[in-house]
Amino acid sequence: MSRFFRGGDDSSSESSSDEEELYSTSEEEEEEDQDQEESSEEEDEEESSDEDEGPKKTGLSRFLVDQASSDSEGSDEEGATKVKSAKDKRFDELEATITTIQNRQKIDDWGSIANEFDKLNRQVVKLQDGGKAPKSYIKCIAELEDFLNETLAKQKVTPKNKKLNATNARGLNAVKQRIKKNNKDYQAQIDAFRKDSDDFMESDEEEVPAPKTKVRFQEAAAPEEAAEDEDKGFARVDKRGKAIPFSPESIQKHLRAIVESRGRKNTDRGEQIKIMEELNKVAETPYLKIRVLQTLVSARFDLGSGTTTSMPLDHWKAAERELAALLTLLETHKDHVVIEGAEEWEDDDKTPILGPDDKYIKVPGSVVSYIERLDDELTRSLQSIDPHTSEYIERLTDEASLYNIILQGLLYYETIRKDASLEIPQESLNRIIQRRLDHVYFKPAQVVKILEENAWKQVSSGVDSAITPRGASGDAGKLMYTLCNYLFDNSEGIIRARAMLSQIYFLALHDEYYKARDMMLTSHLQESIANFDVATQILYNRTLVQVGLCAFRRGLVYDAQNTLQDICGSGRQKELLAQGVMMQRYNQVTPEQERLEKQRQLPFHMHINLELLECVYLTCSMLLEIPLLAQIGSSPDIKKRVISKTYRRMLEYHERQIFTGPPENTRDHVMQASKALAAGEWKKATHFIHSIKIWDLMPSSEEIKAMLAKQIQEEGLRTYLFTYAPFYDTLAIETLSTMFELDSVKVSAVVSKMISHEELAAALDQVTKTVIFRKGVELSRLQSLALALSDKASALIETNERTLEVRTQGSANAFSRKDGRQGGQRGGGQRSGRGGARAGGNAQRQAGGTQFTGGALGAAVRG
C-alpha cells in the first residue's frame, strides 16, 4: 500500500488489539518500504542540492565524478540527518511501552498494565533474535513479576474497604495468569538478571544480526549435514522459526496452549493435531497419555464442527482408534479415572501423583460425550454420501467399530459406578445404553447376533457386564428386553420414552404384533408425544408405521389400515419419517428450517421403504372401502362414513378418466384391482395385486401374496352380496363357494358374520344350506334415487330458512312508519308471489320460522 494512503490510516487513533495482531506483519513490511523510500528520497535531495551548488555540467561530463565532487559529497553526507531503521523504531516503541508500564506501577493501575503487557508481548516477537529477547524486556517482566507478588501479598492483609476496585482487580488477575505462563519461556534469562542485574545489563551487548553471506554459507553447508539430520530427526518449528521442544516435561504446557487457542480465528487445527500426535509419542506416564488423547480427540472433532461439513474420514478413523486406546488405557490403569466435575490440574511443571489418602487420579472429561460425538459424526457422514454407491457401503462398515467403542464405554462406566465415592451420575450410563439401543433396535435378530459376537471378541475375557452378560449376547430379543427394562427402571423423560419405542419397534419388526400393540397402548405415548423433542417424535412415527406393517403381515387388514392412517393419510410420509424434505409451495419453509430438516434426516440404511408403505396402505384401504361403497349403494340409510379420504380421492380420479391404460406403478395396480373387485372379478383383482413387484421386498413374500388372495376372495364375496342382494330370494352356499373358490364353511362364516352385524338382511338356512333374503328391506335403484332427491330438497329448505332468519334477525319493525302504516303493501293486505301469503305488520311470526314454506319447490315436495 502506498505511503500516501498510510497517512490516513495513521491518523486514526483507535484500533483494537486484535487488529494490531492481525496486521502486524503487513504494517512491518510497509514501514520497511516507507523507510527505504524516505532514505532514497533523502539521497536524491542531497544529490540534487550538490548539483545545484556546483557548476552545471552538460553532455558526458555530467555523468563523470571527479575528485572535488566526491569530496563535497562526503562532507554533505556527514552533515545529513540520520534516519532510523525499522528495527530502531521498534526498539523505541518497546522502550516507550516499558516506560508506560513502570509509570502505571507507581499508581497501581492494573487495568492499564494488563493492556500494556499484552502490547509489550506483541512487540517483542518482532525483536527476538535467535530466540533471545531484548534485555530491557527481560528486566521489565522480571520487575513486573516481583511487583505482582508484592501486590498480591499486600492484598491478603488489606482491609476490604481498601482493596482494589473491580477494574484493577480484573487487570491484576489477568496479569497474574499471563505472566506466569509468559515468564516460563524466558526463565533462564530472568534467573540471570536476578542473580546480578548490573552484570546482566552491561555484559554481552546485543548481538549484531549475522550478515547474509553467513546465512548463504550455512544453507550451502546444509546438504553436508543431511546424514546427521536423518539420524537425529527433524525438529518441528513454529511460525517464527523457533524449534518446538517435544519432551514429557513440555506436554502440559503445549496442551494448555492448544486448549486456550481452540475456537479462535486463524487457528491452524491441522498443525495442532500434528503437534499432539508428536506429544502422544513422547508421553510416558498414564496421566499424560490420557490428557493427550483427550485433547487430540477433541481437536479432531473440531474439524467437523461446521453445520454443513462432516468430519473427514481419516480423522474419524483416527479418533476412533484414539478413543479405543483411551478406554484400553483406563481399563489397564484403574487408578486413573476420567469423570465429569473433576478439578483441573493447574501445575504444568509436574504431573499429579497419588497421595497416601488418595485412591484415584481424577482427570476431567466425559467419555460418553466423546462416544456420542463420534456416533453423530458417523451419522453426518452417512447423510452426505450417495446411498447408491459403494462408498456408502464401505462407510457403513465403520458402524461395527463404533459399536465396539460403545460396548467398551458401557463396561467402563459399569466399573467406575461400583465405587460410590466417585459419584458417577446415572444419566451417563443411561446415555451410553441409549446409544447402544439406537444401533440395535431397527436391525434383524441375525444381524444383532453377529454384531454382539464381534464386539465381545474385542473385550478382554476377564471383563463382563452386569447389565448385559457376555453369555446372553447371542439372543437379540433378550438383549433388547434387558437394555429397555434397565432404562425403564433407571431413567425418565425422553430416554425412557425412546427405550419403550425402541422395544416396540423391535417387537413389530419380528412379527410380535400383539406384544407391540399392547405396549403401545399401555405406554400412552400417543397422548404426550407432542411434548417431546423432534427426534423422539420421528421415532414414534417410525414405530407406528412398523406396527402397522406388522399387522398387515399377520393378515389384520383393519388394524393395519387404522394404524397407518395418521402417517399415510397426511401425504407427508417423507417428512414425518425423516426420510426426505417435502417440497413446500409458496416458500413456506425458510432456509434455516430446511437446513434443520436435513440435519434430522436418517441415514439411508435406516429408511422404511415408502413405496412399500404406500402399497400396503392402499391395499388395506381397498379391502375395506370397496365393500363399504357397495353397502352404501344398496342401503342409503347407512351413515355415509369414509375410511380413507386419500384412497377415495384416488379412486374418484381414476374413475373420471376416459381411457385407462395398463397399470404402470403401484398406485395404478391398486386402482385397477379396486375396479375389478367392485365388479365382482376377484381373480382379476388378485392378478393386479400380485403383479406389484414391491411385495418381493418383504420377508415371506409368497405367504403374503397367499394371504392377500384369501382376503380378496372374502371381500369379493361381501361386495357381491351387498351389490346383488336385492335381486335374490335365495342363494345357495355351494354356489357362492364355487364362485369365489372358498370352502363352504368359510362362506357360511362370512355370511353369518354379516347377518349378525346387521349388514345383510337375510337368514341362513342350515338344513338346505342357503341364504334367504328378506324383501322390502333393500331398496330398489329408483327408490334410492327418490330418497336422495328428497334429502337434497330438505337440505335446501333448511338452508334457505336459516339464511332468512339471519337476514331478518332483529328487524321485525324495520318497515313500520310513525303513522302505523306498513311499508311495501299498504294496509298490510295480502301479497301474492313466490313467498306465499304474508301477514300484516302487527301479526306475530310463527315459531321456528315455519312461516317460510319454501315456495313452489316446497309445495311440490309436500304434494
UniProtKB/Swiss-Prot annotation:
Residues 822-839 have a biased composition (Gly residues). Keywords: Cytoplasm, Initiation factor, Protein biosynthesis. InterPro entries: EIF3C (IPR027516), EIF3C_N_dom (IPR008905), PCI_dom (IPR000717), WH-like_DNA-bd_sf (IPR036388), WH_DNA-bd_sf (IPR036390). One of its GO terms (biological process) is formation of cytoplasmic translation initiation complex. Residues 840-850 have a biased composition (Low complexity). PANTHER family: EUKARYOTIC TRANSLATION INITATION FACTOR 3, SUBUNIT 8 EIF3S8 -RELATED, EUKARYOTIC TRANSLATION INITIATION FACTOR 3 SUBUNIT C-RELATED. This is Eukaryotic translation initiation factor 3 subunit C. The gene is NIP1.
